[in-house]
Amino acid sequence: MSMVYINLFLAFIMSLMGLLVYRSHLMSSLLCLEGMMLSLFIMISITILSNHFTLASMAPIILLVFAACEAALGLSLLVMVSNTYGTDYVQNLNLLQC
């Protein structure tokens, strides 16, 4: 396993730990999720390029589309919660139920 894969794996683990530690604020959770998606995207892209998997070349693009959708939904939820309650605490998400 090369140093690049080790660094990307550590970046994923650090983002996961950040998600577990800073789960009270929505903005911190979204940033940690984006870090996880970015490290997964780079890891999948490097694996496909180094092993010459031509059939799986669409996997990073699909992952990027899901990451963009997740970011858009997360930011819209963040704006809605911060405009409604003035803070970005995750506990305010329980109050959004109809």
Curated annotation (Swiss-Prot):
Catalytic class of the enzyme: translocase
Signal peptide: none
Membrane topology (UniProt): Multi-pass membrane protein
Keywords: Electron transport, Membrane, Mitochondrion, Mitochondrion inner membrane, NAD, Respiratory chain, Translocase, Transmembrane, Transmembrane helix, Transport, Ubiquinone
Gene Ontology MF terms: NADH dehydrogenase (ubiquinone) activity
Location within or outside the cell: Mitochondrion inner membrane
InterPro entries on file: NADH_UbQ_OxRdtase_chain4L/K (IPR001133), NUOK/Mnh_C1-like (IPR039428)
GO biological process: ATP synthesis coupled electron transport
Catalytic activity: a ubiquinone + NADH + 5 H(+)(in) = a ubiquinol + NAD(+) + 4 H(+)(out)
EC number: 7.1.1.2
GO CC, any one term: mitochondrial inner membrane
Transmembrane segments: 1-21, 29-49, 61-81
Role description: Core subunit of the mitochondrial membrane respiratory chain NADH dehydrogenase (Complex I) which catalyzes electron transfer from NADH through the respiratory chain, using ubiquinone as an electron acceptor. Part of the enzyme membrane arm which is embedded in the lipid bilayer and involved in proton translocation.
Listed PANTHER family: NADH-UBIQUINONE OXIDOREDUCTASE CHAIN 4L (PTHR11434:SF0), NADH-UBIQUINONE OXIDOREDUCTASE SUBUNIT ND4L (PTHR11434)
Subunit structure and binding partners: Core subunit of respiratory chain NADH dehydrogenase (Complex I) which is composed of 45 different subunits.
Name the UniProt record assigns to this protein: NADH-ubiquinone oxidoreductase chain 4L
Gene that encodes the chain: MT-ND4L
